[in-house]
């Protein structure tokens, strides 16, 4: 797939909200003297021109990073930076603010530092080849999952009364939050990142780490050693 062709049909959106509760300044936590955001930047710039990579944030550090690396920056309004704010609202603001006419948007979270350019390209190729409206990344495993409803437990991925061997269980697909791709015009209509004809793109579990708390951050640091 030609890089020039991809850059004509896709833009990249990276949301960065200041004020993480579990890890202070999470997106700029230093790992090997590089901010967490750098790991996404390093992989996406192997595919996309910097003019097609947009960072939406209320964080001065994000603005400084964008300026340093010549990425596009959107000042996210305070109303879209609350704890209850949805990423979808930030995407709609981005589309309107930058008058986006590109056919498709790729949503990447900085909290998925193990996601590679190969993962992103594979997801783009599946999106194009299957003529999808939206696609999202997952990892696969076999697991015994339970749900607790009030005080009662329910097995949801297996029948505990007729327990199978782990290798005989059906696969469980976990949305890993690393990659979302969707058509711009239909996103405006549905105001959701998954809609229409959709499918998933499978990633390795090792590439699917999502930095949500200090435990995840430590796991990533140990992986890099």
What does each model-identified segment do?
Residues 54, 60-106, 115-118, 122:
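Short phosphate-binding loop-to-helix
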Residues 9-14, 37, 52-55:
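Hydrophobic targeting segments
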Residues 84-89, 93, 113-204:
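Conserved core of the sugar-phosphate nucleotidyltransferase
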Residues 108-110:
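Active-site acidic Asp-centered loop
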Residues 2-4, 189, 200-202, 206-225:
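Hydrophobic helical membrane-anchoring modules
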Residues 36-52:
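A short, N-terminal amphipathic alpha-helix
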Residues 7, 97-103, 128-130:
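Glycine-rich phosphate-binding loop signature in dinucleotide/nucleotide-binding domains
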Residues 1-24:
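N-terminal nucleotide-binding beta1-loop-alpha1 segment
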């Amino acid at each position: 797939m030609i890089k020039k062709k991809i850059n004509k049909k896709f833009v990249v959106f990276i949301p960065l909200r200041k004020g993480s509760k579990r890890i202070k300044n999470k997106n700029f936590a230093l790992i090997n003297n590089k901010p967490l955001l750098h790991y996404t930047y390093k992989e996406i710039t192997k595919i996309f021109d910097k003019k097609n990579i947009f960072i939406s944030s209320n964080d001065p550090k994000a603005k400084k990073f964008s300026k340093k690396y010549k990425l596009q920056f959107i000042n996210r309004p305070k109303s879209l930076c609350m704890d209850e704010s949805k990423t979808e609202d930030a995407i709609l603001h981005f589309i309107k603010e930058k008058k986006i006419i590109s056919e498709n948007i790729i949503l990447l979270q900085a909290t998925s530092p193990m996601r590679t350019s190969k993962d992103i390209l594979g997801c783009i190729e599946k999106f194009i080849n299957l003529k999808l409206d939206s696609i999202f990344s997952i990892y696969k495993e076999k697991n015994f999952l339970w749900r607790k409803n009030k005080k009662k437990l329910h097995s949801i991925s297996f029948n505990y009364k007729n327990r199978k061997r782990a290798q005989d269980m059906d696969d469980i697909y976990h949305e890993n939050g690393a990659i979302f791709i969707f058509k711009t015009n239909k996103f405006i209509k549905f105001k959701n990142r998954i809609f229409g004809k959709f499918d998933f793109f499978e990633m390795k579990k090792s590439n699917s780490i999502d930095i949500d708390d200090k435990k995840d951050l430590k796991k990533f640091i140990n992986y890099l050693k």
